[in-house]
């Protein structure tokens, strides 16, 4: 089994990587959000 990389991260550091504002800051992140909206995801990004 592979190592779970988020197991020892703080909530703040996770948000810095995969929170909504982090997604909006890059073109690739905006593309990700667009895809999740299209699919109908209730939760677009990691919540705090």
UniProtKB/Swiss-Prot annotation:
Q: Which GO terms describe its molecular function?
A: structural constituent of ribosome
The record's keywords, sorted A to Z, are: Chloroplast, Plastid, Ribonucleoprotein, Ribosomal protein
What domain of life does the UniProt record list for this protein's source? Eukaryota
Q: Where is this region: Disordered?
A: 23-48
* A Pfam family it matches: Ribosomal_L34
GO BP annotations of the record are: translation
The UniProt entry, under Gene3D superfamilies, shows: 1.10.287.3980
Record keyword Chloroplast present: yes
User: InterPro entries, per this entry?
Assistant: Ribosomal_bL34 (IPR000271), Ribosomal_bL34_CS (IPR020939)
- The residue ranges crossing the membrane are none
Give compartment(s).
Plastid, Chloroplast
Instruction: List, alphabetically, the GO terms of the cellular component aspect.
Output: chloroplast; ribonucleoprotein complex; ribosome
Q: State where composition is biased (Basic residues).
A: 31-48
Identify its protein family: Belongs to the bacterial ribosomal protein bL34 family.
This chain's protein is named Large ribosomal subunit protein bL34c
Q: Which organism is it from?
A: Trieres chinensis
């Amino acid at each position: 089994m592979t190592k779970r990389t988020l197991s020892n991260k703080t909530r703040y550091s996770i948000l810095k990587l995969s929170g909504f504002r982090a997604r909006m800051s890059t073109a690739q992140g905006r593309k990700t959000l667009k895809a999740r909206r299209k699919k109908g995801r209730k939760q677009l990004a990691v919540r705090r």
